Amino acid sequence: MIKIIPKFQIVLCVTLFTLLIGCSSNKVNKSYYQLANNLSNQNQVSQTMRSTNQFMWIESIDVASFLNKSGIVLQTENIKYATATNNLWVASLSQQLKDRLEQDLTALLPNYLVSSNQITTPSLTVKLFIDGFHGSYTGDAIIEGRWVVTDSKNNIKTKAFARQVPLTDNGYDALVKALSKGWQDEEQDFANSIKH
């Protein structure tokens, strides 16, 4: 009888340990998001070489440190922010904005060679500062920052921007779509200011 009790205790301990491990291993699914491309003329790829003497160098994109994390940021109250742990950017926000900016401005400004690499002496040098790129408790996507553009004669122009794009639905999918739309609207406005 004495030998049965220790065996029973061992079986009971193993069973409880197995249950504990089984309950604690609930895997949380992570979702990864990328800024969408919604420009209608983006799909028109030229099959011929272009010639231009206009070069736009995207020198830097500085994203506020609280935004440049792997998790998507939400403003939960007037002075409170939270970074998502399971809804993440597929690449850093600064990298995604750089990629979008190069690709979209190339489409929007066909007379310019646009690159984040300094290929030659630039006609225009662009610095971008992002101070807001997040969801808000108001149900909007918030995009804020400023452009600093220097021409070849060292003339400097700045343009601040602030956009609130209403979400069409709840959730991170809707937030990223609203951020993408707001960003491309800002790129369009910036491109128009360069053309004129």
Language model segments and positions:
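C-terminal motif of bacterial Sec signal peptides marking the signal peptidase cleavage site
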Residues: 19-22
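Bacterial N-terminal signal peptides that target proteins for export
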Residues: 2-12
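Soluble periplasmic/extracytoplasmic beta-strand elements of cell-envelope proteins
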Residues: 55-60, 73, 125-130, 142-146, ...
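Short secondary-structure boundary motifs at beta->alpha junctions and helix caps
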Residues: 80-88, 154-185
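N-terminal secretory signal peptides
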Residues: 39-59
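N-terminal segment of the mature soluble domain
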Residues: 53-121
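C-terminal/domain-edge helix-coil "capping" segments
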Residues: 24-32, 36-46, 169-196
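Surface-exposed short loop/turn segments
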Residues: 24-43, 107-153
